[in-house]
């Protein structure tokens, strides 16, 4: 959550529209407006980068629930439950690999970040008296074809094993795959095949993000297969 860090090539989003939210208060006003126009009850999923850092340089391996107590209180006032996401992209240590990085220092940085995010999710779940769903998606991959597909996936598996070993009663972990990230089109470490196998073996929820499917994919194929 380094303030002002540039968005890396792994994640692209729009946001330069006139009247865009300039701070968290305005973002909450936008959410309240949207919520007022929709029927039903919704949950709000926050990425770690949306914490309230008060202008302090709190790095992602230092984040705590203190940066999200404002969100928790606001969500309670809105009768809205919170879910959570770790954030591996748009950081000087993001590069092309995070949890699957062969460099122990970088890998441990992201392992610690993800562990802290799970603890934040647990605190959210306890506060709202309803489990917080904590999603883990990492951008890890390669622009060029690699001959070490198995190696990177083994590293990712070991990182996830360490992260998920901590039992937290007020949150539920889930893992998200993606066909590829922009700038990493040749190889994705956390592919659908990898996560389907990992989640089935370890009894972990599998996230199907219907907004992130590519022209070569159809989410109904994944849903119909995973429901068996």
Question: In which residue ranges do the predicted regions lie?
Answer:
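Short, small-residue-biased leader/transition segments that mark boundaries at the very start
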Residues: 2-9
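Short, flexible/disordered intra-domain loops and linkers
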Residues: 10-20, 53-62, 146-148
């Amino acid at each position: 959550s380094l303030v002002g860090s540039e968005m890396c090539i792994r994640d692209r989003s729009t946001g330069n529209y006139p009247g865009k939210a300039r701070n968290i208060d305005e973002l909450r006003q936008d959410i309240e407006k949207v919520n007022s126009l929709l029927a039903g009850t919704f949950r709000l999923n926050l990425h770690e980068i949306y914490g309230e850092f008060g202008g302090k340089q709190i790095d992602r391996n230092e984040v705590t629930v203190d940066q999200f107590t404002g969100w928790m209180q606001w969500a309670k006032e809105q009768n809205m439950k919170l879910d959570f996401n770790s954030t591996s992209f748009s950081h000087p240590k993001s590069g092309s690999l995070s949890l699957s990085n062969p460099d122990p220092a970088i890998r441990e940085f992201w392992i610690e970040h993800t562990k802290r995010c799970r603890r934040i999710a647990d605190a959210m779940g306890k506060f709202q008296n309803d489990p917080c769903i904590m999603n883990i998606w990492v951008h890890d991959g390669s622009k060029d074809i690699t001959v070490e597909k198995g190696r990177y996936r083994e590293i990712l598996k070991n990182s996830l094993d360490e992260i998920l070993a901590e039992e937290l009663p007020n949150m539920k972990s889930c893992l998200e795959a993606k066909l590829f990230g922009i700038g990493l089109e040749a190889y994705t470490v956390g592919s659908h095949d990898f996560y389907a196998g990992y989640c089935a073996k370890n009894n972990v929820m599998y996230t199907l993000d219907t907004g992130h499917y590519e022209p070569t994919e159809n989410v109904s194929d994944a849903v119909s297969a995973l429901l068996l």
